[in-house]
């Protein structure tokens, strides 16, 4: 487990609006809630809007990052996903966590203050040390340079 400090940027968090929590003991990610001045906002069909979380995290440890993911129920039932599909929080970022919500459906969707809109997952990472080569010394792999579905559907 990694200890991650956070700042509360909106005084309603921890009272009127719950702080991030793991929904169950087996949950991999914390639920992040919508924080804005209004009681609700409407995302029109195909609209993308940046929604605040009212929180800032400082992961600090360069061996970790945060990944922001959509909530599966919002995407499946309502067409609400992340505008950038997945978000990355670098360990040295200290600003407010904002969620780009995109309504990819043809129906307006009302986002309510305090609604769970995304998930925040902390993952270990490894920074690579890249070095140029003319060719790869290892023998050709089974995959080689094939990509984009080259192994077929079945």
Curated annotation (Swiss-Prot):
Pathway: Pyrimidine metabolism; dUMP biosynthesis; dUMP from dCTP (dUTP route): step 2/2. One of its GO terms (biological process) is dUTP catabolic process. GO terms for molecular function: dUTP diphosphatase activity; magnesium ion binding. This enzyme is involved in nucleotide metabolism: it produces dUMP, the immediate precursor of thymidine nucleotides and it decreases the intracellular concentration of dUTP so that uracil cannot be incorporated into DNA. The keyword Chaperone does not apply. Gene3D superfamilies: 2.70.40.10. This is Deoxyuridine 5'-triphosphate nucleotidohydrolase. Its EC number is 3.6.1.23. Belongs to the dUTPase family. It comes from Dichelobacter nodosus (strain VCS1703A). Disulfide bonds: none annotated. The keyword Repeat does not apply. It catalyses: dUTP + H2O = dUMP + diphosphate + H(+). It comes from the Bacteria. Keywords: Hydrolase, Magnesium, Metal-binding, Nucleotide metabolism. Its cofactor is Mg(2+). Substrate binds at residues 71-73, 84, 88-90, 98.
């Amino acid at each position: 487990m990694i200890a991650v400090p956070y700042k509360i940027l909106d005084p309603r968090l921890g009272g009127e609006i719950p702080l991030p929590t793991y929904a169950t003991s087996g949950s991999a990610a914390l639920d992040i809630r919508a924080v804005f001045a209004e009681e609700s906002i409407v995302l029109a069909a195909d609209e993308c809007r940046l929604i605040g979380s009212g929180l800032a995290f400082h992961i600090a440890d360069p061996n970790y990052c945060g990944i922001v993911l959509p909530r599966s129920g919002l995407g499946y039932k309502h067409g609400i996903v992340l505008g950038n599909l997945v978000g990355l929080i670098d360990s040295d970022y200290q600003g407010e966590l904002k969620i780009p919500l995109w309504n990819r459906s043809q129906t307006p969707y009302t986002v309510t203050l305090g609604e769970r809109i995304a998930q925040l997952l902390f993952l270990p990472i490894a920074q690579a040390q890249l070095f140029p080569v003319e060719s790869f010394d290892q023998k050709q792999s089974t995959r080689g340079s094939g990509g984009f579905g080259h192994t077929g559907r079945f």
